[in-house]
Amino acid sequence: MVEDSQETTHFGFQTVAKEQKADMVAHVFHSVASKYDVMNDLMSFGIHRLWKRFTIDCSGVRRGQTVLDLAGGTGDLTAKFSRLVGETGNVILADINDSMLKMGREKLRNIGVIGNVKYVQANAEALPFPDNTFDCITISFGLRNVTEKEKALRSMYRVLKPGGRLLVLEFSKPIIEPLSKAYDAYSFHILPRIGSVVANDADSYRYLAESIRMHPDQDTLKAMMQDAGFESVDYYNLTAGVVALHRGYKF
């Protein structure tokens, strides 16, 4: 129960106290960590791999650079960035959830991604890095779970180097109305059933669907990035806006 004096936010469609949301989100990802990759493939029919490849292509990351893969989970982007930056570069896979971080570390080590990757448990709202550290920051399917998104965007801006760029890959608002209706039906009826069968957890995937609907749409997120200090902010609608990639620069 939320007391009248408490600051509130949303957890899916629920209204909760701000200090409760992080723990509630943590419970979701502790629950789904072991099935996260399998569920991503099933939920998106494998298309998430194309969305992530497009993000890599838009990142401009080069050999010798330093990259932060924030809310990096099981490390799909980190693995690709590790190859791009080479031995003279560095990639930090950061996630607030220790279960997801453990899965990412084990997965990447098993496929031989070692040497230029470090793992840090970190809250996006208060990143534990010095100012002007990173050439590029990505946050992939993570921003919608952050309690105070504006604070997190300012934190990302602070740790970017001048000339650096932020890429936010996230579920968004479909731009074709018939697709939007079909997407709603899939998200709220089929997705929880898949979660129940594969991960034995319908509730976490019901939260996923609800959190997507509560996330800012394309233009709202663009404005939020601009308010945080980012310049030349643009976005690309992927799969007719089911997902959007936002990119902004620190000059």
Curated annotation (Swiss-Prot):
Pfam families according to UniProt: Ubie_methyltran (PF01209)
Gene3D superfamilies: Vaccinia Virus protein VP39
Domain of life: Bacteria
Enzyme Commission code: 2.1.1.163, 2.1.1.201
PROSITE patterns: SAM_MT_UBIE, UBIE_1, UBIE_2
Function: Methyltransferase required for the conversion of demethylmenaquinol (DMKH2) to menaquinol (MKH2) and the conversion of 2-polyprenyl-6-methoxy-1,4-benzoquinol (DDMQH2) to 2-polyprenyl-3-methyl-6-methoxy-1,4-benzoquinol (DMQH2).
Keyword check for Transferase: yes
A biological process term (GO) from this entry: aerobic respiration
Keyword Transferase: yes
UniProt KW keywords: Menaquinone biosynthesis, Methyltransferase, S-adenosyl-L-methionine, Transferase, Ubiquinone biosynthesis
Binding-site residues, S-adenosyl-L-methionine: T74, D95, N123, A124, S140
HAMAP family: MenG_UbiE_methyltr
Pathway stated in the Swiss-Prot or TrEMBL entry: Quinol/quinone metabolism; menaquinone biosynthesis; menaquinol from 1,4-dihydroxy-2-naphthoate: step 2/2; Cofactor biosynthesis; ubiquinone biosynthesis
Protein's recorded name: Ubiquinone/menaquinone biosynthesis C-methyltransferase UbiE
PANTHER family noted in UniProt: 2-METHOXY-6-POLYPRENYL-1,4-BENZOQUINOL METHYLASE, MITOCHONDRIAL, METHYLTRANSFERASE
Entry similarity comment: Belongs to the class I-like SAM-binding methyltransferase superfamily. MenG/UbiE family.
Catalytic activity: a 2-demethylmenaquinol + S-adenosyl-L-methionine = a menaquinol + S-adenosyl-L-homocysteine + H(+); a 2-methoxy-6-(all-trans-polyprenyl)benzene-1,4-diol + S-adenosyl-L-methionine = a 5-methoxy-2-methyl-3-(all-trans-polyprenyl)benzene-1,4-diol + S-adenosyl-L-homocysteine + H(+)
One GO molecular-function entry: demethylmenaquinone methyltransferase activity
